[in-house]
């Protein structure tokens, strides 16, 4: 199965995405990662106001197969979390690049986005396996 990813998204090696929207960045996990996890049953996210370092664990996602940590693709302050995904984890599974987003961050260093893979590079990486 070949995966497609929104062209505006940037991706970390650990399969989290960052999508810049003005001064904020929406964060989630890729459709590829969601597919690998299988049925998602629980999501744990940080609180609004928490500060995250790039690469730091910011929560976890639990599926019937495994529990996986998630890592911040950029550093910043959590300004919003997706309460709908916390209440109904299947939202993440149904639309990981849309309604299944996880966090909105105010990045402390927006240039960190440039170090992430673009959608084409990420797509080539995950579709090659």
UniProtKB/Swiss-Prot annotation:
SS bond list: none
Residue numbers of N6-lipoyllysine PTMs: 65
Name any GO cellular component annotation: cytosol
**Alphabetic keyword roster:** Lipoyl
Function, in words: The glycine cleavage system catalyzes the degradation of glycine. The H protein shuttles the methylamine group of glycine from the P protein to the T protein.
One matching Pfam family is GCV_H
In Gene Ontology terms, what is a biological process of this protein?
Answer: glycine decarboxylation via glycine cleavage system
Give the quaternary structure.
The glycine cleavage system is composed of four proteins: P, T, L and H.
Record's family? Belongs to the GcvH family.
Q: What InterPro entries does the annotation carry?
A: 2-oxoA_DH_lipoyl-BS, Biotin_lipoyl, GCV_H, GCV_H/Fam206, GCV_H_sub, Single_hybrid_motif
- Please give the cofactor(s) recorded in the UniProt entry for this protein: (R)-lipoate
Q: Does the keyword Manganese apply?
A: no
Xref: Gene3D superfamilies: 2.40.50.100
- Where does the record place the Lipoyl-binding domain? 24-106
Which protein, by its recorded name, is this?
Glycine cleavage system H protein
